[in-house]
A protein has these predicted regions:
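Active-site C-terminal subdomain of aminotransferase-like
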Residues: 1-71, 75-76
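Conserved C-terminal alpha-helix-loop-beta "cap" of PLP-dependent enzymes
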Residues: 50-51, 55-123
Length: 123
């Protein structure tokens, strides 16, 4: 630690100058779970993910799990992955079988209706 005095961090903590990370996290969670704020913030992302899910189901896609969240886990033919990867950001989850892979598509607070429509057109 270069020129730092011995046990400097301990002295700072003892005098209350360094707040524990746990306290900061607790304050954030307390605010998020007050008056339904977390649900309000997440609602648009979840709504768009469910629109994506319904649109994919209508196109015949299968799902690894039935997710009520902003994350959807779809089963895709391996042959589609290179093309899909050049157009869409997705996460590899696992091989489903020799010919299929489970991928994760996620929406966020910044996802737009137009982006979901575009993704449905790509898929």
């Amino acid at each position: 630690h270069g020129n730092m005095p011995r046990q400097f961090e301990t002295m700072v903590k003892r005098h209350g100058a360094m707040v524990a990370k746990g306290r900061l996290n607790a304050v954030q969670f307390d605010a998020l779970f007050t008056d339904g704020l977390y649900e309000k913030i997440c609602a648009p992302a979840v709504r768009l993910a469910l629109k994506l899910r319904d649109g994919l189901a209508a196109k015949g896609y299968r799902f690894a799990i039935d997710s009520p969240t902003n994350q959807q886990f779809i089963i895709v033919e391996n042959s589609r992955l290179p093309e899909l990867g050049s157009k869409v950001a997705y996460s590899f989850i696992e091989k489903y079988d020799a010919e299929h892979t489970v991928i994760r598509l996620a929406t966020s607070w910044a996802t737009t209706e137009e982006q979901v429509d575009e993704l449905l057109n790509i898929l």
